[in-house]
């Protein structure tokens, strides 16, 4: 069994992991019964891992959200979706690999599935542009959503991107316009939309497929208006202050649940989704089916009105009165 890469704050587990691997190797090479010792060490490692992950800072949660072995959109689709058929192209000559989609079946219900897709290694990440979609990707996503709306297919989106691609070519092709159209049109959809932040949800790149009736989020995922590194560079001219920015941005599931941005935070297996992806997939499937059943009981008008009201209720506008100005003076 290959060792999983450990994050910096998981280093206290290194010695335990090495001992576990040594005992497994001993069991493979001899007939010695080491099952009891192995079970004890694995239980100890699980307890320590749980203790570590219960006290993660926002900056550490970002590391978990970006873990290279964290389940991706395609991983989740393969876990709980039957008869998956990927659909390609935006009908303008582009087929962005950073944003994928297609039709599948969850249980007995046909659905449209759309999500950001990162790579597992450098070569695949380059091919998928590290999950940063170009305008063609968002136009492809909107084409698939229109298709779902026409055939009354519920839409499931999976958010996992550091942000929309901000290169010169993307700007020339209308990146801002493509995302803006998606925001407008998603409010008009007549079918249920459930979005899940499975990794990192960055800025407009996440919002481009994130206007949903229900927004779910894994507990070690993050959802933010800008990456902490970018925020620190803008505010303090120092990317090293990213941990401070991460805390100030309130990017965690608990914070966003309190703010009314997300509707449910899904628990992750001890150590994060990368340690037990199948368990994570079952948790996500159960949550999606539960919310989908609730949304399908609403009429088209109720669905759209509730979606609009949900986003209108987010945030507050604070304006100083003349009395406040006088007091400050």
From Swiss-Prot:
Enzyme class: transferase
Disulfide bonds: none
Enzymatic reactions: N(6)-carboxybiotinyl-L-lysyl-[protein] + acetyl-CoA = N(6)-biotinyl-L-lysyl-[protein] + malonyl-CoA
Domain CoA carboxyltransferase C-terminal: 40-294
GO MF term set: acetyl-CoA carboxylase activity; ATP binding; carboxyl- or carbamoyltransferase activity
A GO BP annotation: fatty acid biosynthetic process
NCBIfam families (UniProt xref): accA, AccA_sub, PRK05724.1
HAMAP family (alphabetical): AcetylCoA_CT_alpha
Family of this protein: Belongs to the AccA family.
Biological role stated in the UniProt entry: Component of the acetyl coenzyme A carboxylase (ACC) complex. First, biotin carboxylase catalyzes the carboxylation of biotin on its carrier protein (BCCP) and then the CO(2) group is transferred by the carboxyltransferase to acetyl-CoA to form malonyl-CoA.
Subunit field text: Acetyl-CoA carboxylase is a heterohexamer composed of biotin carboxyl carrier protein (AccB), biotin carboxylase (AccC) and two subunits each of ACCase subunit alpha (AccA) and ACCase subunit beta (AccD).
Name the UniProt record assigns to this protein: Acetyl-coenzyme A carboxylase carboxyl transferase subunit alpha
Designated gene of the protein: accA
């Amino acid at each position: 069994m290959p060792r999983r890469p450990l994050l910096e704050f998981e280093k206290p587990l290194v010695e335990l992991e090495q001992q576990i691997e040594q005992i497994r190797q001993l069991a493979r090479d001899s007939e010695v019964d080491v099952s009891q010792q192995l079970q004890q060490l694995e239980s100890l490692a699980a307890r320590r891992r749980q203790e570590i992950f219960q006290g993660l800072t926002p900056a550490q949660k970002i590391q978990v959200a970006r873990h290279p072995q964290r389940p991706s959109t395609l991983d989740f689709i393969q876990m709980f979706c039957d008869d998956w058929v990927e659909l390609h192209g935006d009908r303008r000559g582009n087929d962005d690999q950073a944003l994928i989609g297609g039709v599948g079946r969850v249980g007995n219900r046909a659905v449209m599935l759309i999500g950001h897709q990162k790579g597992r290694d450098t070569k695949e990440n380059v091919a998928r542009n590290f999950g940063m979609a170009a305008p063609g990707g968002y136009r492809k996503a909107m084409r698939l959503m229109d298709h779902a709306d026409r055939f009354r297919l519920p839409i499931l989106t999976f958010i996992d991107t550091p942000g929309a691609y901000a290169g010169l070519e993307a700007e020339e092709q209308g990146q801002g316009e493509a995302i803006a159209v998606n925001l407008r049109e998603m409010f008009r959809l007549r079918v249920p939309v459930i979005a899940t932040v499975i990794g990192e949800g960055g800025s407009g790149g996440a919002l481009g497929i994130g206007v949903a009736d229900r927004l779910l989020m894994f507990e070690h995922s993050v959802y933010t208006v800008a990456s902490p590194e970018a925020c620190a560079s803008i505010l303090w001219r120092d990317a090293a202050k990213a941990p401070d920015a991460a805390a100030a941005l309130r990017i965690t599931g608990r914070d966003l649940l309190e703010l009314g941005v997300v509707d449910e935070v899904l628990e992750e297996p001890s150590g994060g989704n990368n340690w037990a992806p199948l368990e994570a997939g079952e948790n996500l499937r159960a949550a999606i089916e539960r919310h989908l059943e609730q949304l399908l009981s609403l009429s088209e008008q109720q669905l759209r009105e509730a979606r609009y009201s949900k986003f209108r209720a987010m945030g507050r506008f604070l304006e100083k009165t003349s009395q406040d100005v006088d007091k400050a003076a």
